[in-house]
């Protein structure tokens, strides 16, 4: 039975609109294309998520390089697919969110164990593909599959699966209650064991809680509020709109993307570390998702200035060259993510002379953050009830009966079933969010005219600062990085500093002489940065409640166990999306998609490791889980 046939059976019997089908094994390219075509033609209110669990195998590259599949995903010819053969989840969104395809690559067991449980069991059907890795099938794996499944989950085998694999799969499925030879048999004992496994997983998630909002029926929908106006909040509005949510975005400016998302050009490339740690892994998956968002919006006809011309990353002094070398050789990077290049290659790619080799990010490039922001929100308005309130500075927020109300100097808004604070440099302005651990850094980006040899620059350069190829006859370079600087006026000294960074990075190159900052053209704003450089996404921690519990369980032998097993307190139905730093174009869209999934109680496209990495309470909970002391001010 194919996934398409399973889906039809589930649609015929299910009343809820969200359907999740999971498949063990990559399956065939033809079957996946058939499913996408059927979903594009299907007139239905159902939203389908297909989760494909596959080891990283040679056939995967056939999927990644298939132009017809890429065109189906984006609805536009000559589009490349933003997928890479890396471990973890990569989400592709098709047909305005009516079909989501999650590729979970790597060990079956590891990928299943890392799935966050947002609600109870959520998988409606399991399909065993004919190219599954039979050697990975065992009882422990099938218990993981059963834990994630509804009790009435369908279990199906591809008819081309070998007889041995069929027999093994059916036997293991029967042992965990996924399959029975008797048509109406329900094994309550097995269902109880599956429920116990879910409860255990929920408890393991307790320190970094996943908190769906109490969503109301569509006919009684009071909507979701977002405070923001930049690329992250616009992408969040789009992700919520793809789930048929009613969204209101409150922006204090007279147009979208007037703050940190207002630069003329921003670079898109991942943050990599030599050991490819959790942060590095998140940035790779976020990078691919952001590229997919960008391409899809452009394919939909939204005007976005961008060029995925690649990014050349080199050192600028002995220390940074060693750092780049460590990143280059510390991990076997997938070629779609990063390639080691020599100086001659770097020069050929960049179109200007470079003396250093380094890393090349072939899918990266630059985009207009303003265009990206507007396109995301315009698309949200095109597919759902998304409204925008400009010139509306929200000065206060408060909750009553688990719904949220917002206040400006002249008006009151609400109720809203959920509220997301995503207003960049102002995320800490409310009493509920004042202790969120993110710091503002002023950044000035310089604009210089494109001329002479400088005009030949054909890739984004990243060394001590960055520089973009020209757009509308201007290059962007920068940016300055000044902590806690509230003044956002133009700085002549930072303009010169930006020039010196490029001069220092590419000493002796004649094209540097064509960089002219004397026009005093620049843009200044503040970006919020976290100590660990990870974005902040999830429920807002209730710090007063955390500190009250801390006083009761302070540094006792049992204190670590308490925090490991009790859900960390949060403000109900209040969330934050921020702390994106200087790479929000890369990290923001996936964080927004994951938050929208969490709010709506749907499968998240990130692992449990990423949930804890991004959780807004992480700085406090890391200490508590290690039995370390907190300062009672809450700012530790």
Curated annotation (Swiss-Prot):
**InterPro entries documented for this protein:** FAD-dep_OxRdtase, FAD/NAD-bd_sf, tRNA_MAMT_biosynth_bifunc_MnmC, tRNA_S-uridine_synth_MnmC_C
A molecular function GO annotation = tRNA (5-methylaminomethyl-2-thiouridylate)(34)-methyltransferase activity
Q: What is its main location?
A: cytoplasm
State any GO BP term from the record.
methylation
Q: Does the keyword rRNA processing apply?
A: no
Question: What Gene Ontology terms describe where this protein resides (cellular component)?
Answer: cytoplasm
Q: Which family is this sequence assigned to?
A: In the N-terminal section; belongs to the methyltransferase superfamily. tRNA (mnm(5)s(2)U34)-methyltransferase family.
* PANTHER family per record: SARCOSINE DEHYDROGENASE-RELATED, TRNA 5-METHYLAMINOMETHYL-2-THIOURIDINE BIOSYNTHESIS BIFUNCTIONAL PROTEIN MNMC
Q: What is this protein called?
A: tRNA 5-methylaminomethyl-2-thiouridine biosynthesis bifunctional protein MnmC
Organism for this UniProt entry:
Shewanella halifaxensis (strain HAW-EB4)
Taxonomic placement: Bacteria, Pseudomonadati, Pseudomonadota, Gammaproteobacteria, Alteromonadales
The gene for this chain is mnmC
